[in-house]
């Protein structure tokens, strides 16, 4: 039986170190062909996209023995080919495994966004798995229904941090159903 795992982590938090060590040991015990390290990283955007924080976080992971296989780069705009090559070069992650993690209206759009970038094929190839072409039409229809509802319902909730939308993101997502 093969075990497969993926991990994304904030390398700056000390409380995450035991988990990072656990995934490092998992890969050691089960091999590269049975594990996949996915690092979610923020591309800081000011007047231009900054890649230094991503390079730094990958460097910190490497210091503890973890080399990410895939980078999901959180950004509001797609990475240019030049930036993707630069990130690939300085993080030692294959260029096709440097993926945009763009802002989406609904979390349900994320799998479609990643599939459009070929992330499913990248994962399957890395793990040497055969997969058939995904049948995404039901998922696409679900996303379309969520984005274009036929009816509306007003729901109000009281909270301390209602001005900060992210504070209640999980509740907002749950209420969409």
Feature annotation, model-predicted:
Residues 35-130, 143-146:
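Internal gly/pro-rich beta-alpha loop/helix module
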Residues 13-19, 166-169:
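Glycine/threonine-rich flexible loop motifs
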Residues 10, 44-45, 77, 161-163:
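Short histidine/acidic/glycine/proline-rich micro-motifs that form metal-
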Residues 132-154:
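Glycine-/acidic-rich phosphate or pyrophosphate-binding loops and their flanking alpha/beta elements
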